């Protein structure tokens, strides 16, 4: 290679790349050592753009081993990328990523393909192929790009067809994990006015993760992508581009790499707050653990022998193995991952004459996704269930042949369907678990999977489509004034988005409890539907349009002012609900939601349901206030803009200062009971962004520097409440520095470096409960595990009375045990509060109980004598703590990267060894911070050596990534209390190495 050049753009000091420019600009006369970008929607030298932008052309992507999005983030300062829990991903720029979780959330980082915005794209899943360039813009970009993005824009530019002549290339690669990859393209001119380009890739490899349960490999890849493009130039000044792209993946990709837990022996929390460890949560703390316990069954007057266990006894994960290796698991559920994406684009660019240009473009996108994975990444101990399964078989059998009653004197017809669905071969045979089907009938409708171990897994699926149209008129006058004006209109439609959690224990509870509920209310044999958790967005429609423009005023050859403005209008309507054991469903039903006993189901707790209950006669949605779905509409309209002043000190040195105001629309939270005090909606977020920068060339050294300060209002943050992701708003301050240096001592030797510093903090008071510690570090509090739903609440003393609050909980539990609470039977035998183990990170005590009864007792329902001196408060969502001053997630304090290569001439050949070193500092995985939420710093070293033939017509390459095989964590997710408070972690890929050969024609 004849010299290396910088790749970082602007002030934002990005990453360094090699000399090249986008193919769209190929007709222009430019220095071959310059990068041409379209950051301001026109072709400009990278070093002339007063925006924080980084660009990677095809050669840079290859040399720096940037094969996918995870690789891309390593080469950029103040940028991180991580997969997230629900099939999504978060690209974080300067501390701001997709901290909002939900179908109505907009992305903080806008992803564009050829300048067109994408929604829920799977570009993050696949491999990069036949790209002309990737441009990364930092900071709000609403006055130039599509939909709003408060953190920035990543614009993937595909290689366009060339009318200059026929061309083709092919590359074949083989690596460890039996990885086989192929990619290539062919370009064919069609006369003098058109050309066609077809490109594609294919990747197949074995899994990264060993499953010791059955000695198999999981987390493999089997994917391909294909793209066809047409360029037509019918006459001078007219360019028409058409493109269609398809991506498909079907394999056993895992959405998470590891699940971690410091096991809680008390069962109140499941996992403790002291550290992340290679243990498994205590199953007694889960929704299944409490609702199938002898203690809960006792409060309902059900036979203790039918309970799957005791909250104080051996739990279903006793003996479960969680290997202390990020690439080794023990799971009895094979993950599945199936996704496809269509993208169709068209644009026409017309020179209008007189220095004016018009560009009109449209984009259509369709995404389907279906993924399933073991929910707890562990194997349950079925021996714990043995007694209950034998009892179920007893209840399902007639006392004597032909007798309609069982040995307990109850009708067999109510229990036989449960046993037939879940233990078809008897209590010692296969155990069957519901499949997550839309009908909601699960195993009781014949939709089941059966195995020797109790299953628990989740499923995430979605179907969405979107389209957008954009028009831009820009000027290129010779005088001191130019402008750009444009508009965009887009529609997004989500027709299905569901998250399911399925477990044998849920099936058992919904079958057994449903049988007794139906029997006691005179209903026919029934189960509780749905026999799995389903958070379902049935329909989401988003309509948005924006009008934007910029004016460029040159006061002199050196001084230029840019002023931009944008009007934003967003409308969102969502139809959603969650179901889990919500209503009786008669056996034999083909659609659980068509039950005749669903009148008491209420999908919208914000309205008052006159007849709450799981067995009310009537169809779902037939009673006023008891809605079948929560339906909400929100609308937002805002003005944003920017101002930039740049000054060219010399032709090789520029400084600039900018102010921009960014906006991201608000949205709608899923339906939750009012007791959790979560707003139906969340507000838009705004950022006032200030930036100064300098771009400099000093002969063979290039130095770019940037400083920035962000003032955020109503930044959107997600947390889990009652098994559901909800979003809050906080204020935040962010500031940082970025530097990048490129040194070319000779034309053969090139060195690039970049470094960044980032400070983030919540800047205003915001009180939220930490899901890992509902007692908020208080010794005068008791954390409660509610045996009626698996949630946690907390009881806190109003006067610091430690003994008093513990005595209060013990007294209320004794009242429950005695059967003195209306609607509850005696015999629960709930125990007194107990301390958590040493090193747990929990100062409070813990106990099993019933939060609703504790709230009533605190209000005097059982007399003033129960309430201790000073009084107590019951916190349904935990005791809130002030998160002011806490760091934002996914924002490392420091990042550093350096690369060196030497292109050694060998006659007609060139041998180029290269090495890259990357350091990413520590960050936090969620807003509550602390050691347990820390994402450790990590380093990665990559290396390769490439031999290029004459005129680079062929090459052979040997490469290695992650040389030292680091288990680098990029993000984490803390689950709900009813699931056990475990932590899912996401990592970079392990060490990979291989060889590749390629040819150009």
At which residue positions do the language-model features occur?
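Membrane-embedded beta-barrel scaffold of Gram-negative outer-membrane proteins
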Residues: 349-353, 357-363, 370-373, 498, ...
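Outer-membrane beta-barrel domain signature, strongest for Gram-negative TonB-dependent receptors
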Residues: 215, 221-483, 490-493, 702-704
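N-terminal Sec signal peptide and the immediately downstream disordered periplasmic leader
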Residues: 1-64, 70-76, 344, 999
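Outer-membrane beta-barrel translocator/receptor signature
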Residues: 64, 106-108, 120, 129-138, ...
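Structural signature of Gram-negative outer-membrane beta-barrels, strongest in the C-terminal barrel
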Residues: 233, 473-476, 482-492, 538-710
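C-terminal beta-signal and adjacent terminal beta-strands/loops
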Residues: 760, 918-926, 947-1001
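Periplasmic N-terminal accessory/gating domains of Gram-negative outer-membrane beta-barrel systems
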Residues: 51-99, 109-128, 133-142, 159
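Gram-negative outer-membrane beta-barrel transporters
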Residues: 709-711, 728-927, 996-1000
